């Protein structure tokens, strides 16, 4: 066995010791005050009449879940810290991987919002050169998260020695690449030799004495030359890295909690930008910026400054990262319109990238919409979650259904230690040598491109990039042998250069049509009420906007009201709200919001209809769609027996339990038609129902039913053929067992058809209408504790309407 085979373990041990030694002094703080409540600023906590109570962090706890508290302490810098870098460290002893559900804080220092504190960001630099005896007021706006019930709050002041910590990162960054490097390869051997020599220079016999610090300095000088100069300058592979924190607008939390998450995370980003001049950050979703602007305008102004400096990139295209399966085409256009307009007006930035890392599939109509909205590029990672088939390309042209092509790149970042054979990649990347090398190995278009995009940082309240990631970036920017060379680059810069690099390259592949996501198939149907409300409001807005335009000579166009309504629609199309993958509380909020929107739209619409509709006894019907329609129209409480158009055509009116209906022909697109009220004309009934009620003849079909209310035959008279296959039933309701392997509200798994029950418990089978416009069959069935109600309308049209309700 060669000594060198153990060098990685030797170096690892020394690095661990240096990490511990870098924390040179620690001073406990214990005399805190606590007050329950969700306060925005210190003055709000002071204005609350409830008193602050003493909180001894050595013996007391605070309690959740889903609770807010305000902590306060006045601390003095110990004299031992005079002239030293002063850090604050916060710990709750909750260390689970999912920071989205763990306690989170926003730190105020002397009344000023300073930094978010979370599992990944526990240390805050208060002063690079502290003054002994100086006093600070430290305050923590605190949220417990939704998972745990009891917490510590352990806060200390500490000195972190920059030279010891610097040597730690000098050594640990190349060391962390070893698992991805070929064991007998030149790069690993070179790095091992250099690190071994550095270890030999370090004198750990008496930490913090003169000899110790001389050895630390000698080791750093040696590495600066032997590693970061002599083994640097390599550019064979580039990793374009952009800091990022993907924040779901709702998911395991409500939108109200997202307002807090974005403030904490963006405050952390801004604080680290003060400490690391090369740090660049990108964030999409103008909705998040709007939340910050409302709550902490001083932080928002800092972002504006960083954008102007070229260090913060507001990019992404849409107002929120919206679902692209259920959202209508018009709403997708509005996502771009509102998103691009906000970033242009607020920051002077014209978005060119659609940034949707976490959305559950992408319609083939998107490339055309993107191109017409001024979007040139598309980025995602979610397709790497496919259940069965790995996406064959990572850089490609995406050709939409009309032939429009969009340059697309899938981020290939792996988790630390993750197999390169896995499908899965992440947009919450760790800027870590193992992850970056793995991302390059996973990348499939190496023949046309040597530059991969890395979005790195913890999301969903995790605060984005960490100091460790930024220290790693600083060293990997040197281009270490065997490692990708890191550069901090905006996503737009990356895509512009990628477009130039692959332009006219015949090896650039093309994907045509929908980018279907082979997973989370249940998101097409989960939380059906919420999905129905979204579609209803989309259609109501089409009505309102057209009628407002037509009536603006008589009634002022409601610009502010429409703008507010669209903001409400767009946020609720976020990819964990509309698909149904958020917690129950989210949908209690959207239920209320949709009801309020519908009431407002109805009032605005009625005001404009009243202004537009001519006086008199006639009936005016509006068609707000973009095509002429001939259809059955619900007429409310219309008393007419028949209606006549200007050409003399007479249309019978049929009374119903809800009012009246009529079939009206050739209603003009985006227009209206007024009908005169006339007496009914005698005509033959268009529907013939058998005496036993189990057969109906319409102008287009003959339909028969069995004893369960299921259709046993649908004969198409025009084409003279039976529609149903022999032995098959129509109007059959079948209930499948929904027990997916992993994600209950997301998934419908491939085996779902293995177990099912047919709904055959017929309670009512009654013909409730038979008139000149339609015949209606009312059916009720029981299943378990539910009742399924149908009113099947047979029309004097080629289609059959089946409104269905399930309690």
Task: Indicate residue ranges for each PLM-predicted region.
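Mature N-terminal, pre-catalytic/accessory segment of carbohydrate-active enzymes
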Residues: 1-242
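Gly/Pro-rich turn-and-neighbor structural signature
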Residues: 214-229, 287, 293, 330, ...
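Catalytic alpha-helical scaffold of carbohydrate-active enzymes acting on polysaccharides/glycoconjugates
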Residues: 223-242, 264-276, 291-350, 364-372, ...
């Amino acid at each position: 066995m060669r000594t060198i085979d153990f060098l990685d373990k030797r170096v690892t041990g020394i690095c661990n010791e240096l990490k511990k030694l870098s924390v040179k002094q620690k001073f406990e703080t214990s005399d805190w005050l606590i007050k329950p409540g969700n306060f925005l600023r210190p003055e709000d906590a002071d204005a609350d009449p409830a008193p602050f109570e003493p909180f001894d962090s050595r013996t007391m706890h605070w309690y959740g879940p889903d609770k807010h508290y305000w902590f306060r302490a006045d601390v003095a810098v110990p004299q031992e810290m005079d002239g030293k870098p002063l850090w604050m460290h916060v710990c709750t002893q909750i260390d689970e991987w999912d920071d989205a559900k763990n306690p989170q804080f926003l730190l105020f220092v002397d009344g000023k919002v300073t930094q978010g504190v979370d599992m990944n960001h526990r240390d805050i630099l208060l002063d690079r050169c502290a003054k002994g005896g100086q006093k600070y007021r430290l305050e923590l706006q605190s949220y417990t998260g939704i998972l745990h019930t009891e917490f510590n709050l352990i806060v200390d002041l500490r000195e972190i020695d920059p030279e010891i910590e610097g040597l730690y990162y000098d050594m640990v960054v190349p060391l962390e690449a070893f698992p991805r490097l070929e064991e007998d390869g030149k790069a690993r051997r070179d790095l091992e030799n250099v690190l071994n020599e550095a270890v030999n220079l370090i004198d750990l016999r008496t930490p913090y004495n003169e000899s110790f610090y001389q050895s630390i300095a000698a080791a750093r000088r040696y590495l600066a030359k032997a590693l970061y100069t002599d083994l640097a300058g390599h550019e064979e592979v580039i990793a374009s890295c952009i800091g990022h924190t993907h924040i779901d607008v709702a998911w395991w939390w409500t939108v109200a909690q997202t307002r807090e998450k974005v403030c904490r995370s963006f405050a952390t980003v801004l604080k680290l930008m003060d400490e690391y001049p090369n740090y660049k950050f990108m964030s999409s979703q103008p909705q998040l910026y709007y939340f910050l602007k409302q709550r902490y305008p001083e932080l928002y102004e800092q972002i504006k400054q960083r954008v102007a400096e070229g260090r913060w990139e507001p990019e992404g295209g849409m107002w929120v990262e919206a679902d692209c399966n259920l959202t209508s085409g018009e709403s997708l256009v509005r996502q771009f319109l509102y998103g691009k307009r906000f970033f242009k007006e607020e920051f002077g930035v014209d978005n060119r990238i659609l940034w949707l890392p976490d959305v559950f599939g992408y319609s083939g109509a998107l490339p055309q919409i993107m191109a017409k909205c001024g979007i040139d590029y598309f980025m995602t990672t979610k397709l790497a979650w496919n259940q069965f088939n790995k996406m064959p390309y990572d850089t490609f042209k995406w050709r939409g259904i009309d032939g429009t092509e969009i340059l697309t790149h899938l981020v290939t970042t792996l988790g630390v230690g993750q197999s390169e054979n896995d499908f899965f990649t992440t947009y919450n990347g760790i800027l870590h040598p193992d992850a970056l090398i793995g991302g390059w190995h996973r990348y499939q278009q190496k023949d046309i491109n040597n530059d991969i995009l890395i979005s790195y940082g913890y999301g969903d309240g995790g605060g984005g990039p960490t100091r460790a990631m930024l220290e790693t970036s600083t060293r990997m920017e040197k281009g270490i042998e065997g490692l990708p060379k890191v550069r901090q680059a905006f996503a737009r810069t990356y895509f512009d250069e990628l477009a130039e690099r692959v332009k006219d390259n015949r090896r650039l592949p093309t994907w045509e049509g929908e980018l279907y996501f082979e997973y989370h198939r249940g998101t097409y149907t989960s939380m059906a009420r919420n999905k129905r409300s979204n579609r209803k409001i989309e259609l109501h807005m089409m009505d309102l906007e057209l009628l407002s335009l037509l009536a603006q000579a008589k009634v002022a166009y409601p610009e502010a009201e429409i703008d507010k309504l669209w903001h409400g629609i767009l946020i609720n199309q976020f990819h964990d709200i509309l698909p149904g993958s958020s917690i129950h509380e989210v949908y209690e909020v959207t239920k209320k919001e949709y009801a309020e929107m519908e009431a407002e739209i109805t009032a605005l619409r009625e005001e404009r209809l009243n202004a537009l509709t001519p006086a008199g006894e006639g009936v005016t019907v509006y068609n707000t769609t973009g095509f002429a329609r001939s259809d059955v129209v619900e007429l409310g409480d219309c008393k007419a027996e028949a209606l006549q158009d200007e050409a003399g055509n007479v249309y019978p009116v049929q009374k119903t339990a809800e009012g009246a209906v009529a079939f009206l022909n050739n209603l003009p697109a985006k227009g209206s038609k007024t009908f005169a009220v006339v007496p009914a004309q005698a005509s033959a009934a268009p529907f013939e129902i058998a005496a036993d009620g189990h057969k109906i003849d319409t102008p287009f079909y003959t339909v028969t039913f069995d004893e369960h209310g299921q259709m046993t035959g649908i004969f198409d008279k025009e084409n003279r053929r039976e529609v149903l296959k022999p032995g098959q039933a129509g109007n059959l309701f079948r209930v499948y067992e929904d027990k997916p392997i992993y994600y209950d509200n997301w998934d419908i798994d491939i085996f779902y058809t293995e177990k099912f029950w047919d709904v055959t418990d017929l309670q009512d089978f009654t013909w409730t209408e038979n008139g000149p416009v339609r015949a209606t069959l009312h059916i009720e069935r029981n299943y378990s504790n539910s009742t399924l109600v149908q009113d099947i309308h047979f029309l004097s049209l080629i289609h059959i309407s089946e409104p269905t309700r399930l309690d």
